[in-house]
Amino acid sequence: MLLAPGKGFVFLASTKSGSTSIETAFMSHSQMILRKPPAIKHTTYAGFQRFLQPFLNSKGFPRESYEVVCVFREPIDWLSSWWRYRSREKLANPTDPKHRNYTGEVTFEQFARAYMEGSEQFAQVGRPSRFVRPRSGQVEVDRIFRYDRLDLLVDFLCEKVGEEVEVGSANTSPDRSFFLSRECETELREFFAPEYRIYERAIGG
């Protein structure tokens, strides 16, 4: 998460959406950077409204003085990125503290079904729709950009900071192909209905 109210923006770091690359590129323009642990880096919008928005207000940055922005990935693509990320070789080691999250021996369809059922630790990765949900009675995220149009987010942030900034890649998931049966894909799209409503409205569509 980047807090740059002096430049007119706050960037929420949604998971599996290029947030590390954006943070690395624009961190020098931010007043505060929340990167570790992941639970803090990926603070939800509601969490921001509860804890950080009042802090910024107390420092002379009322909510209307900056825009809150984030990235939203196509839901099934987002889920497959988690599946691929948790198949990395490091997690295959039984002595690794996060070995229980290893998905190297799980098909994507098995992962998707476990995700919908909430039955396995390795498939507990949250929901994108909950990440952007505001607190009751409060304003929504100002701008949500599609992951496949990160160029639009970069252009927006460059305009805010007043200079061209080059964005690289970081924290990428391993390459791994997958197959979904038509039945499972249909169920997954129905499960992700709230996410698809947000994705369809996101900037870049």
Language-model region placement:
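Membrane-interface amphipathic segments in extracytoplasmic regions
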Residues: 1-205
